[in-house]
Amino acid sequence: MKRGQGPTIRRRRLASELRRLREAADLTIDEVGEKLECSASKVSRIETGHVGVTPRDARDMLELYGLTGDEREALVQLAREARKPGWWHAYKEVFTGTFVGLEADASSLRAFQALLVPGLLQTETYARAVIRAMRPDADESDIQRRVAARTARQELLVDPNPPQYWAVIDEAVLHREVGGPEVMAKQTNRLLELAQLTHVTIQVVPFAAGAHPGMEGPFLVLGFPEPADPDVVYVDSTSGGFFLELPPDVRRYTLMFDHLRAAALKPDDSLDVIATAAERYSR
């Protein structure tokens, strides 16, 4: 799939353009809501990309902002395309479309994990053990559904046009026995296999590195192919995670990732550490 052409990134792009045009028209969110007979909160949610916008609403807003002709119709068409369901809609009860949609459109993904193997790199048995541990009240059908959703996400790495994926993990990830030795043996070997892909890089931050920026928690920096689509950061948490889009926040996490890469072992040395773990679990 061509990166940056999915419905989520189109919605984000349209939201940014609607906000820019409103500001250029010297209108406040409250004034737009009053003129279009809708709530100011609806306008705000549209501009932040938290909700989609119908082609009719987009046309009404664009007319109010003074945009006409082909330029207006191009943005109305963008609104239509942004409403098309992505593959992840089949798993809407598992994860938010915004996260998976942006992940699917990204041209680069920079992930840090201190406790677990990143989701895109997990084997099915490792994912099952993680989900079962983190959701002790889930029944087997719910667990299976979540495993299937995670497996579907992983198709991204074998796409004909995959994103550049760079994962930095703490050495503790290799020592935390999730699911037992057999599960860990398969998981560590899976990491070695994926690291052979030209678009995948895996590094390990050794215990000897001491304190590091990633101690704050796991995060993902998503980059996109078009200059009009700025980078965004996803900070993971048990309550569902959240996005950071303000430039200072994105710069901070980008710098954190750069420091983590520097603190980590070189990719080849990291694979040696992973191979040692794989051998240990295979005994």
Residue ranges of predicted features:
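The short coil/loop that forms the "turn" connecting the two helices of the helix-turn-helix
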Residues: 27, 38-39
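Positions that flank functional sites
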Residues: 37, 77, 210
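C-terminal regulatory/effector modules of DNA-binding transcriptional regulators
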Residues: 180-283
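Short acidic (Asp/Glu) and glycine-rich catalytic loops that position anionic groups and cofactors
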Residues: 37, 54-58, 232-236
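Tryptophan-centered motif/residue detector
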Residues: 38, 87-88, 219
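Interdomain hinge/linker segments and adjacent boundary elements that couple functional modules
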Residues: 2-16, 20, 24, 30-34, ...
